């Protein structure tokens, strides 16, 4: 069975011409939502619906405005609010050393000084840097900015991330 990875969520419609607003959950939003990109649509219960080919896409604030081929009116896309767009594993490109996909990071164990502190549960994109959410037992989630002084090493094969928690991050 083919594997798919989430690249965004359709959060609303845009205008009357069948465009949708997609909240991206990928570092490669410009590539994923560019003309010709093929994505898969899944409903809110993670059931595959159909493949979609991007006709156009443009960033707007914190989301992308995307038009898919074959959808010409708001009525064609309104039912897809809350649906997920994913990319097939076979359509992912190989990355350079030191680069990784979100799905390779989420679920990784996080260590500081070889002591397990939690697991990465989510990656946020609030602005200049991604923020990795670390779920910890008995403590509130830890938010770590993806910057060199904090994220020391990422081993996607071992699902391990080594960090140095700077003063003020764990108050």
Curated annotation (Swiss-Prot):
This protein's record includes keyword rRNA processing? yes
Domain of life from the UniProt record: Bacteria
Q: Keywords on this record?
A: Chaperone, Cytoplasm, Ribosome biogenesis, rRNA processing
**Assigned GO CC terms:** cytoplasm; ribosome
In terms of InterPro entries, this protein maps to: PRC-brl_dom, PRC_barrel-like_sf, RimM, RimM_N, RimM_N_sf, Transl_B-barrel_sf
**Which Gene Ontology terms cover its molecular function?**
ribosome binding
Query: Where is this gene product found?
Result: Cytoplasm
Q: Which residues form the PRC barrel domain?
A: 97-169
Q: Which GO BP terms, alphabetically?
A: ribosomal small subunit biogenesis; rRNA processing
Q: Pfam families of this UniProt entry?
A: PRC, RimM
Q: What family does the Swiss-Prot or TrEMBL record give for this protein?
A: Belongs to the RimM family.
Q: What does this protein do?
A: An accessory protein needed during the final step in the assembly of 30S ribosomal subunit, possibly for assembly of the head region. Essential for efficient processing of 16S rRNA. May be needed both before and after RbfA during the maturation of 16S rRNA. It has affinity for free ribosomal 30S subunits but not for 70S ribosomes.
Q: Please give the record's comment on domains.
A: The PRC barrel domain binds ribosomal protein uS19.
Q: How is the subunit organization of this protein annotated in UniProt?
A: Binds ribosomal protein uS19.
The protein's matches in HAMAP family, at most eight in alphabetical order, are given as: Ribosome_mat_RimM (MF_00014)
This one is known as Ribosome maturation factor RimM
Q: Which gene encodes it?
A: rimM
